[in-house]
């Protein structure tokens, strides 16, 4: 796969994968994947194996693997941007789509391709400029993405009767357009809400995706751009069962185009249980700083954590539905902080909590996973570089998540996945079993 054109590389991979799956299903189509219990049906289908999702797999102990590669491996192997050594999200997207670590040339082709596709249609700009300032940034993001479907190659081609075997090509084009435009939409929302509507400026085709994004947001610190490269890489995908990934997969299965599928995913990400956790962590840390005035002694922190738990709340940023060890997405953010902001008081507090919280949660005995997740750290890093607008953080998460769910959406259409339609049951029906 030496070609720098991602579509050409994909076109060569798809027939092989179609054949592999066809053979596998012929031989093992009837194999049972496990038992489904009554509790699973009432419990949000936790642990139920019912989806095929190719781009990443979550190992309870290892954490996320993107096409088989762990986060430390991705940090080592993916092409880097600046002198800071963080991987470029373009490289991760190439990996998610192809299963192959890209070359520097392939990544710079993607950067240029996205820069070329980035311009927003004027009606979307007008719409964003007309939103009231009290409309949540995630609502603005979702609405703008939905309105972008005026540009949908897939919807147009479907209306013209395109062959099923060509669906993936149009989904690819729309996914590439959408990823290219997302930083412009996100930056416009940021400037309108927090920078008096100032201009996001123009895309520079010589810069990478993250660098253009931080420029448009109005940040000039090269370290912040490095953080953005890391952030957009590690938040990109987390298996197929989480709310945003599952939503895009479900809506996409109705052959709704990538804009509609991704907007639906963003409405899921806007939910407090999915995308708001890093905001909640910062709120909790701020309260903790106010309360534990005794210069952050371990004992007073322990007391504060116990008070949180005893009042029936959870410690935000700790625990995960699947993970059973420290989230590697937490670890790489911790390493970034140790390298770039070791003296920051908020980072010191987060690092101190890392030593204390797991022990308290183990003593309490209720948590299956007492270790920190990705959200325990990201807010502190963003704040350090001056991005203090917590309401906006989920928008960054959303821009990143596009890489994973749209890579999968291309494959879902390439592999001809059908409309998703599980069977539901009533309580009476379950009791009658």
Curated annotation (Swiss-Prot):
Domain of life: Eukaryota
Subcellular location field: Mitochondrion matrix
A single GO cellular-component term on record: mitochondrial matrix
Principal subcellular localization: mitochondrion
Pfam families: Citrate_synt
Signal peptide: none
Keywords of the record: Mitochondrion, Transferase, Tricarboxylic acid cycle
The enzyme's E.C. designation: 2.3.3.1
Reactions catalysed, as given in the entry: oxaloacetate + acetyl-CoA + H2O = citrate + CoA + H(+)
A GO molecular function held by the record: identical protein binding
SUPFAM superfamilies: Citrate synthase (SSF48256)
Pathway: Carbohydrate metabolism; tricarboxylic acid cycle; isocitrate from oxaloacetate: step 1/2
Active site positions: 274, 320, 375
Positions of oxaloacetate binding: 329, 401, 421
NCBIfam families per the UniProt record, alphabetical: cit_synth_euk (TIGR01793), PRK09569.1 (NF007128)
Assembly behavior: Homodimer.
UniProt family annotation: Belongs to the citrate synthase family.
Function of the molecule: Key enzyme of the Krebs tricarboxylic acid cycle which catalyzes the synthesis of citrate from acetyl coenzyme A and oxaloacetate.
More details: Citrate synthase is found in nearly all cells capable of oxidative metabolism.
Protein name as it appears in the record: Citrate synthase, mitochondrial
């Amino acid at each position: 796969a030496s070609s720098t054109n991602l579509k050409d590389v994909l076109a060569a991979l798809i027939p092989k994968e179609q054949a592999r799956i066809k053979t596998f299903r012929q031989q093992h189509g009837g194999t049972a994947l496990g038992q489904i219990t009554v509790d699973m049906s009432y419990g949000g289908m936790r642990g139920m194996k019912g989806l095929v999702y190719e781009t990443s797999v979550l190992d309870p102990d290892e954490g996320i693997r993107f096409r088989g590669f762990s986060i430390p491996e991705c940090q080592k192997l993916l092409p880097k941007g600046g002198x800071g050594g963080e991987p470029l999200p373009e490289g991760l997207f190439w990996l998610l789509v192809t299963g192959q670590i890209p070359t520097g040339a392939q990544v710079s082709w993607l950067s240029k391709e996205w820069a070329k596709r980035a311009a927003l249609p004027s009606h979307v700009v007008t719409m964003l400029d007309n939103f009231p300032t009290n409309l949540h940034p995630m609502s603005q993001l979702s609405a703008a993405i939905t309105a972008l479907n005026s540009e949908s190659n897939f919807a147009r081609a479907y209306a013209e009767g395109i062959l099923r075997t060509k669906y993936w090509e149009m989904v690819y084009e729309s996914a590439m357009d959408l990823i290219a435009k997302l930083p412009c939409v996100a930056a416009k929302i940021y400037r309108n809400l927090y920078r008096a509507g100032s201009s996001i400026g123009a895309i520079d085709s010589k810069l990478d995706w993250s660098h253009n994004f931080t420029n448009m947001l109005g940040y000039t610190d090269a370290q912040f751009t490095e953080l953005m490269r890391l952030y957009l890489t590690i938040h990109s995908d987390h298996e197929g069962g989480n709310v945003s990934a599952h939503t895009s997969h479900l809506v996409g299965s109705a052959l709704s185009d990538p804009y509609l599928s991704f907007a639906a995913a963003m409405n899921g990400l806007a939910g407090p249980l999915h995308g708001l956790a890093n905001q909640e962590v910062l709120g909790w840390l701020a309260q903790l700083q106010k309360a534990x005035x005794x210069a952050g002694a371990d004992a007073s922190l322990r007391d504060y954590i116990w008070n949180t738990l005893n009042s029936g709340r959870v410690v935000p940023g700790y625990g995960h539905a699947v993970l059973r060890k420290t989230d590697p997405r937490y670890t790489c953010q911790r390493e970034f902080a140790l390298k770039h902001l070791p003296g920051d008081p908020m980072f010191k507090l987060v690092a101190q909590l890392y030593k204390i919280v797991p022990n308290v949660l183990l003593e309490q005995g209720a948590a299956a996973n007492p270790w920190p997740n990705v959200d325990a750290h990201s807010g502190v890093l963003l704040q350090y570089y001056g991005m203090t607008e917590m309401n906006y953080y989920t928008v960054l998460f959303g821009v990143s998540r596009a890489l994973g769910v749209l890579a999968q959406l291309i494959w879902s259409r390439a592999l001809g996945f059908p409309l998703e339609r599980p069977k539901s049951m009533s309580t009476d029906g379950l009791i009658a079993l």
